[in-house]
């Protein structure tokens, strides 16, 4: 009987710990969608309690001076597929790369192209499709 009670209490404590961790993860992912305040923005805190109090597409979010109005930033979602494997990526080159950087994220590439490291530079590349095993 003691073992059963200990097990139940242990599971309850684990559930509480996981719930708190999940809440922190959700908060961190929401927080990362907003730009860091610039020195000018940092001096002006527009306090709010709910999103309805905010103009246009701004949202009420936790900040350094309480809940304040912030404008979300489009962080983009990675496109489907993977970057092709490139043997030259694993070999360190000597000297500067002669090619120009074309992109820094998938959203800068047209269509379904992905921003991948090819040779020594980031460039828009056709993706390798995701293969699902059944």
UniProtKB/Swiss-Prot annotation:
An example Gene Ontology CC term for this record: extracellular region
KW Repeat (keyword) present: yes
SUPFAM superfamilies found in the cross-reference section: Elafin-like
Entry PTM: No phosphate or carbohydrate binding could be detected; however, both cholesterol and triglyceride are associated with the mouse protein.
Alphabetical keyword list: Disulfide bond, Milk protein, Protease inhibitor, Repeat, Secreted, Signal
Gene3D superfamilies (UniProt xref): Elafin-like
PROSITE patterns xrefs: WAP
Organs and tissues of expression: Milk-specific; major protein component of milk whey.
Compartments where located: Secreted
Domain WAP: 27-73, 76-128
GO terms assigned for molecular function: nutrient reservoir activity; peptidase inhibitor activity
Function: Could be a protease inhibitor. May play an important role in mammary gland development and tissue remodeling.
Name of the featured protein: Whey acidic protein
The species this protein was found in: Mus musculus (Mouse)
Upper taxonomic lineage: Eukaryota, Metazoa, Chordata, Craniata, Vertebrata
């Amino acid at each position: 009987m003691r073992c059963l009670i200990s097990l139940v209490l242990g599971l309850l404590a684990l559930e509480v710990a996981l719930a708190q961790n999940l809440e922190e993860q959700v908060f961190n992912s929401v927080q990362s969608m907003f730009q860091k305040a610039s020195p000018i923005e940092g001096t002006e805190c527009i306090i709010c309690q709910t999103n309805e109090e905010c103009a246009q597409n701004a949202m009420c979010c936790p900040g350094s001076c309480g809940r304040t109005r912030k404008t979300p930033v489009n962080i983009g979602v990675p496109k489907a597929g993977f970057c092709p494997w490139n043997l030259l990526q694993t070999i360190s080159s000597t000297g500067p790369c002669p090619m120009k950087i074309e992109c820094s994220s998938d959203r800068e590439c047209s269509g379904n192209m992905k921003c991948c490291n090819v040779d020594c530079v980031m460039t828009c590349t056709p993706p390798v499709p995701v293969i699902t095993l059944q």
